[in-house]
Each structure stands twice: as structure tokens, then as C-alpha cells.
Amino acid sequence: KLRSMCKNAEKNGAQWADKDDDRITNVGKFIRKTRIDELPQLINVVKGEMSFIGPRPERPEFVELFSSEVIGFEQRCLVTPGLTGLAQIQGGYDLTPQQKLKYDMKYIHKGSLMMELYISIRTLMVVITGEGSR
């Protein structure tokens, strides 16, 4: 990923970023708004380590934390992670772990070609327009 936060942003350990987090630089706000901070992960898609669409991978610290706080959160780790997903186009950075899980599980259990086309088009619109997620 591209760096969107100031250096030493996590000097006190991993922290979940808020939408208006003061650790996010001005350039970081732009790359997050357009989601281009995710583009380096296209390499992971080409290598087969990620898919284009699927639940976004979380850092191990957050998976452990959220799995202990949100029943079923670890289930989203059972599928190949994706560069973009239903949770990202429905709420992006504003979602709580519970909300993210709801969208990820909907994609995992009810995903279809039409849903993938919808996610792809919405993702492209976010990148082109910079209009976040909703």
C-alpha cells in the first residue's frame, strides 16, 4: 500500500484509523479518497495471492482483536482477500468491524456475477470521481 499517514503514526501500536484521523497526511487524504493507496496490491492479484473482489485483508492485530469482539469476524478470512469489496463500496473507511462483517458475509454467501459487476463498476467510479464510498 502507499503511505497515507505520517511517520510514526503507530508508535503506540496498531490503531484503527478514523475518517478524520489527524495522522493522515494531506496527500494521504487524496489517495484514500480515490483509493489509489490500494493500487500496489494489484501485484498481489497478479501473483494469485489476492482476488480483485473479496473481503479486504485486515492486519493480523486487527483480525485477532475483532475476532474476540465480533462473533464470526474470522469467517471472512476463509476466502481469498480482495482488492475491493462490497464493504468498501457501501461504507469504505466509515464502517465499524460489525458493519464490515455484514457486507463481507453477504458477498461470501450471496455473491454472484451481477454483484461482482456492480462492485467493479462502483469501485471504478470511486477511483475516477474520488467520491468515497456512498
Model-inferred region functions:
Residues 1-134:
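Conserved small/aromatic sequence motifs within transmembrane helices
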